[in-house]
Amino acid sequence: LLFAAGFETTTNLIGNGLISLLRNRDQMQMLRSDPTLGHRAVEEMLRYESSVQLDARTALEETDIAGHHIDAGQVVLTLLGAANRDPDRYQDPDRFDITRTGTQHLSFAAGIHYCLGAPLARLEGEVVFERLLARFPTIDADTTPVWRPSLTLRGLETLQVTVR
């Protein structure tokens, strides 16, 4: 379960993070110049292009949320990717900013459903981007990225790059 659950989402973190850096060269240069921003950069990658976009939960008891009645047993869809771009929560939410603080995104869910692999995924992301940017001074996208069609997961199907 851990291997299957963590593989695709971590792969998506790396691909989504790379395309975010390629589309925001100033942020790539900032991270390259200051590798200590690695943790913040990965948090912003997770917030900005969440690997998991949608999740379903079943209400255990009757409740009201934001004026909407929910019956016990009713399935509720949580739009994690949308929550991570909530303008009431994040200043300028559609801007990719690796210096952003206080992200507290929902990319790994929350509460009893919080992802067990979150610390490992964060570490893998930090190591990948630190090594990638240190080793290759030039990284360029050769083609337009193709996103995998999915309602629940956001990840690239293809992204061809040249590294030098």
Where are the predicted features?
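Cytochrome P450
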Residues: 1-164
